């Protein structure tokens, strides 16, 4: 019988966004690592779309393309990547929000190429400080999985409401990148 509680040391949950947000957000994901003290989970992430990760207890160290591991800020924005990212995580929880190119364009006027293959502190980088309410949807202590997810979705709905400049052009780019006829770009 399942109790609904995660088994083992790592629980990773994915949530599809509501249909109105799917052109902008790939998924929301919640990672929780259980353990004692400095027990570490280590892994590598494949190249991916841009994303925002909120790590309330700053329990994740990461590096890109073989670079040194650094302790990530509480809210980290990552541009699209073409390299692997190596990470180590201590017990704690985090949320991630995968961003499609139009999602990035609606959340920031910063060109993605300025953030490609790197991360920035979303709470101090001037291009992202307006995301404070979104980052604040995940408190230091757990507010409960459903409550945090719903708070993130409320903030995303507000932030993604206005079209971005050149959105039609960005959509054509997205469609080309996700066309199943092409296997590499």
Model-inferred region functions:
Residues 1-183:
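Alpha-helical bundle regulatory/interaction domains
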């Amino acid at each position: 019988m399942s109790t609904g509680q995660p088994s083992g040391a790592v629980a990773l949950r994915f949530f599809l966004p509501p249909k109105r947000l799917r052109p902008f957000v790939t998924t929301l994901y919640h990672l929780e690592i259980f353990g004692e003290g400095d027990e570490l989970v280590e892994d590598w992430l494949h190249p991916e779309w841009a994303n925002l990760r909120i790590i309330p207890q700053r329990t994740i160290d990461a590096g890109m393309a073989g670079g040194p591991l650094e302790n990530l800020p509480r809210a980290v924005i990552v541009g699209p990547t073409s390299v692997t990212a190596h990470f180590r995580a201590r017990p704690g929880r985090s949320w991630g929000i995968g961003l499609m190119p139009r999602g990035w364009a609606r959340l920031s006027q910063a060109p993605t190429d300025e953030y490609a293959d790197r991360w920035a502190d979303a709470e101090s980088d001037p291009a992202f400080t307006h995301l404070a309410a979104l980052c604040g949807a995940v408190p230091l202590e757990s507010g409960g999985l459903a409550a945090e997810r719903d708070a993130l979705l409320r903030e995303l709905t507000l932030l993604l409401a206005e079209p971005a400049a050149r959105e039609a052009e960005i959509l054509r780019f997205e469609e080309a990148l996700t066309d199943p006829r092409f296997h590499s770009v």
